């Protein structure tokens, strides 16, 4: 992630479009090996710094409101784009990461071992991708080198993957599926290196350029916070909209009734200096006069007076069906789940519209939510509803009450 350390650094190169991407898929299907292979193959072309499996697997821990998430952020380029790539070693880390928005992906690479085919976590990650709004994914069918002469079996696995993607409303018929061997590519075998380059060509062409909200007021969700001795407090996260320049005044909003004003005195991405952070950037910002205790994950840094924290609002929600990973039973008016906004989760209570007694899985309903802590939300803010470690609903704020 972006870390602001010293000023004697190179400037970040903005000549290529910046895209956020990540590897998803079942445990041991080769996500981290593929991440290492992509960086290694592109490094040979001068487009990345090679990262080995161990450095990605020993990912730093990120604290998400008391939840530990291991994530590895690496960067690489193709001829067309600059990519920030997130990989999570643990399955639980993926779930938390995708839900809290730590890995806000413009697209995903789904890794499926051809030796196994789609497995339970393959299905779960596809479902989660749909829930959190990942628009498209490209498939890497891995471990092909272990299936020489088994062409028919590989064809069947490919059909199964396409059907699975279509069942979750992805375009299974047209999703690129690249057959390869991440380990073979990592070991420098030319036929498998070529497949990694083919994969990145597919990512370049199939994953659409996201529409960034540049003209809206600056807002960045705080993902992580740390102190740099002698310089101050740094917050990292993804810029959701707008842009901010060095020495601009901003506010830290959420959890408290009053926002805290501060000035941005440094901006970095991947250890390179920026003059401006803009929508889509995974940036680190140095904040003047802010103590470590004044800011935490789940708050937002925003242009002054553009967003305020709220506890009560009306929302339109969809309760996931049992088959979609939701509840098996209805919920009633004393239900108190967690509501996930951007990088934070807050417990809240619900009130139904008059005449409604319960919500059945599969229902689309309007209801009122009251959170136990004020959060920076506004009309149109999206959230998910979680309980006991699973997503049970998704919603949008329709009207602020207080």
Curated annotation (Swiss-Prot):
**Entry's CDD domains?**
EF_Tu (cd01884), EFTU_II (cd03697), EFTU_III (cd03707)
Where Mg(2+) binds, per the record, is at 32
Family the entry assigns: Belongs to the TRAFAC class translation factor GTPase superfamily. Classic translation factor GTPase family. EF-Tu/EF-1A subfamily.
Main localization is cytoplasm
Protein name in UniProt: Elongation factor Tu
What catalytic reaction does the record list? GTP + H2O = GDP + phosphate + H(+)
Q: What PROSITE patterns has UniProt attached to this entry?
A: G_TR_1, G_TR_2
The residue ranges of the tr-type G domain are 16-211
Q: What taxonomic ancestry is recorded? A: Bacteria, Bacillati, Mycoplasmatota, Mycoplasmoidales, Metamycoplasmataceae
Binding-site positions, GTP:
25-32, 87-91, 142-145
Region G4, as annotated, extends over 142-145
InterPro entries, alphabetized: EF-Tu_GTP-bd (IPR041709), EF-Tu_GTPase (IPR050055), EFTu-like_2 (IPR004161), EFTU_2 (IPR033720), G_TR_CS (IPR031157), P-loop_NTPase (IPR027417), Small_GTP-bd (IPR005225), T_Tr_GTP-bd_dom (IPR000795)
Q: Does the keyword Transit peptide apply?
A: no
Give me the Gene Ontology terms describing cellular component.
cytosol
Tell where it localizes.
Answer: Cytoplasm
Region annotation (G2) ranges: 66-70
Pfam families (alphabetical): GTP_EFTU (PF00009), GTP_EFTU_D2 (PF03144), GTP_EFTU_D3 (PF03143)
HAMAP family (alphabetical)? EF_Tu_B
This entry's Gene Ontology molecular function terms read: GTP binding; GTPase activity; translation elongation factor activity
Q: What assembly does the database describe for this protein?
A: Monomer.
Q: Where is this region: G3?
A: 87-90
Q: Which UniProt keywords apply?
A: Cytoplasm, Elongation factor, GTP-binding, Hydrolase, Magnesium, Metal-binding, Nucleotide-binding, Protein biosynthesis
User: What is the recorded function of this protein according to its Swiss-Prot or TrEMBL entry?
Assistant: GTP hydrolase that promotes the GTP-dependent binding of aminoacyl-tRNA to the A-site of ribosomes during protein biosynthesis.
